[in-house]
């Protein structure tokens, strides 16, 4: 199959298995959820009644005071007491094998092509790391919400886009399922497309 390049009259020959496969929603959902879960810190921690300092002595005798019986001032029903089902640090990551991950990326790329959200250009860059220059270039292409994917890290592009809302710059190694679906359009250089094909082959 062919992908028409926006800044050239030629078209780029690409693999049908990478850019023309059927959309597998269940697989994409599973991989995106796993990716997001892996980004969680999982460092939340609370103290149970046995971990809160103090509370070893019975506050008052069992009977004869007229008050409700109490065995510890660190009971979960007391102020400053422990937490009944205290949250503990945990690993939220989910296992996703390489085949599934690659399949999800292929599925997303194919869907981007179908929805005409993938824009391929011969080259994309700016002469200086100026946000104004990048905004002008994107305005020219009528792009506001876009992920720019280049073959290698472009320092000028990265610095210019750093302060822009809804604009991100990644190299091929930095793409992931979440970033590919998070933006309205995905702008890729021809070299980046070739590298992605090799990576997913």
Curated annotation (Swiss-Prot):
Pfam families: Ribosomal_L4
Keyword Cytoplasm attributed: no
A GO cellular component entry from the record: ribosome
Keywords, sorted A to Z: Ribonucleoprotein, Ribosomal protein, RNA-binding, rRNA-binding
Disulfide bridge map: none
Example of a GO MF term: structural constituent of ribosome
Gene3D superfamilies listed in its UniProt record: 3.40.1370.10
InterPro entries: Ribosomal_uL4, Ribosomal_uL4-like, Ribosomal_uL4_dom_sf
Highest taxon listed in the record's lineage: Bacteria
Statement: the UniProt record of this protein carries the keyword Ribonucleoprotein: yes
Region of interest called Disordered, as start-end residue ranges on this chain: 45-66
BP GO terms, sorted: translation
Cited PANTHER family: 50S RIBOSOMAL PROTEIN L4, LARGE RIBOSOMAL SUBUNIT PROTEIN UL4M
NCBIfam families, A to Z: rplD_bact
Functional summary from the UniProt entry: One of the primary rRNA binding proteins, this protein initially binds near the 5'-end of the 23S rRNA. It is important during the early stages of 50S assembly. It makes multiple contacts with different domains of the 23S rRNA in the assembled 50S subunit and ribosome.
Family, as annotated: Belongs to the universal ribosomal protein uL4 family.
Assembly with partners or alone: Part of the 50S ribosomal subunit.
Name this protein carries in UniProt: Large ribosomal subunit protein uL4
Organism: Aeromonas salmonicida (strain A449)
Gene that this polypeptide is encoded by: rplD
């Amino acid at each position: 199959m062919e992908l028409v390049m926006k800044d050239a009259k030629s078209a780029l020959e690409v693999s049908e298995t990478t850019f023309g496969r059927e959309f597998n929603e269940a697989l994409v959902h599973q991989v995106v959820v796993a990716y997001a879960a892996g980004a969680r810190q999982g460092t939340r921690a609370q103290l149970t009644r046995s971990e809160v300092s103090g509370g070893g002595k019975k506050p008052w005798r069992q009977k004869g005071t007229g008050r409700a019986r109490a065995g510890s001032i660190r009971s979960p029903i007391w102020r400053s007491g422990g937490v009944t089902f205290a949250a503990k640090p945990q690993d939220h990551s989910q296992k996703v094998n390489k085949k599934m991950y690659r399949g999800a990326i292929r599925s997303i790329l194919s869907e981007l092509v179908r929805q005409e959200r993938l824009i391929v250009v011969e080259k994309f860059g700016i002469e200086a790391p100026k946000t104004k220059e990048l905004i002008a270039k994107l305005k020219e292409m009528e792009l506001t919400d876009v992920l720019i994917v280049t073959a290698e890290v472009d320092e000028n592009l990265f610095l210019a886009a750093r302060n822009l809302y809804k604009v991100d710059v990644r190299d091929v190694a930095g793409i992931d399922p979440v970033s590919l679906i998070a933006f309205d359009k995905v702008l890729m250089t021809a070299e980046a497309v070739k590298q992605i094909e090799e990576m997913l082959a």
